[in-house]
Structure formats: C-alpha cells, structure tokens
From Swiss-Prot:
Primary gene name: ATL73
One Pfam family in the UniProt entry: zf-RING_2
Signal peptide (from-to): 1-16
GO MF: ubiquitin-protein transferase activity; zinc ion binding
Identification of the protein by name: RING-H2 finger protein ATL73
UniProt family annotation: Belongs to the RING-type zinc finger family. ATL subfamily.
Native organism: Arabidopsis thaliana
Length: 176
C-alpha cells in the first residue's frame, strides 16, 4: 500500500437530505452577511481615502495662496530687521567706519578675515566694525556691507534706527 506525504482524510460530505434545513439556511445567510460587511468595509475605506486626498489637495492650494499673497503684499513695517539686514548700507556710510593699519596691538577679536579666511599681515588695512569690534580686510567687508547691514561674524546690525522730529525713520546712518 502506497502512502502519500500530504494525504488528507476525506471529510464527509453533507448531502441536502442529511442536513438540517435550518443549518444550511444559516450558513448561506452568514455568507451573505460576511460579503455585505466586506462590501461596506471597502466603501468606507474608499471614502476615507478620497477624504484624505481632498484634504491634502486643499492644504496644498491654501499654502500656495498664502505664499502668493505674502509675495505681493507690501511690508507694513519699514524698519523690519530682516529687511534692513538684506538691504545693505550706502557707500557714504562706509566711509564713516574707521580703517586702521593692522598690528598685533590692535584690539581685534580675530587674527584673520572671516570673509576670505586670509590672515592679517602687519601693515595691511583693515576695517574694524564699531559695535562688535570685529575686523576684516577693507575690500572684503566693503563688498559685504553693500549688500548686508550686519556684521558677517555676529550678525549685529550696524544701522541706527533714529526717529527724527518729522516722525519718519531712517536706517542709513552707521553707528559709531
């Protein structure tokens, strides 16, 4: 007699005449309930997926609208610190900042220019910023200050915000 590895025992089949009619009806109705529950679950998951996609779409549209409206609205505060840092200072204001000849006795916080990373050589002209006492090569710091109004090392603003008698604000004067 041959043996099969995955031999299964035959399950007795229930014929319609042997089975209780109530049991067959219950199993058919259970199958219908399970099928309708699966259908309802698929519909609910599809609705949730659609709601998520709609929410993400609305979020993207709102972010785009807010970004565009910020771009076109004028800045209400003319003395905004970020605007002043990006604005730079005028050439005539650069002349107010003192230029010295570098020597080891000069009271500067560093011995190299942090813009070009070059060491200071004795006798070289350097510009020392008045508020923070950081020193830089004249060409390096002048180029920087034409487009920025702060120290490149500590970001301290070099502009004085004075309110003249007429009430308008000026930010072109360099602190000395």
């Amino acid at each position: 007699m041959a043996r099969f590895l995955l031999a299964t025992q035959a399950t007795p089949t229930i014929s319609a005449t042997d089975a209780n009619p109530r049991t067959l009806g219950d199993s058919v109705s259970n199958n219908k309930n399970i099928a309708s529950m699966d259908t309802h679950m698929v519909i609910i998951l599809a609705a949730l997926l659609c709601a998520l996609i709609c929410a993400l779409g609305i979020n993207s549209v709102l972010r785009c609208v807010l970004r565009c409206t910020r771009r076109f609205t004028p800045n209400e505060d003319p003395v905004d610190t970020n605007a002043n840092v990006a604005k730079g200072i005028k050439k005539r204001a650069l002349k107010v900042i003192p230029v010295d000849s570098y020597s080891p006795e000069l009271k500067m916080k560093a011995t190299e220019c942090l813009i070009c990373l070059g060491d200071f050589v004795e006798g070289e002209t350097v510009r020392v910023l008045p508020k923070c006492n950081h020193g830089f090569h004249v060409k390096c710091i002048d180029t920087w200050l034409l487009s920025h109004s702060s120290c490149p090392t500590c970001r301290q603003s070099l502009l004085e915000h004075q309110t003249p008698a007429n009430g308008s604000r000026r930010g072109d004067d360099v602190a000395t």
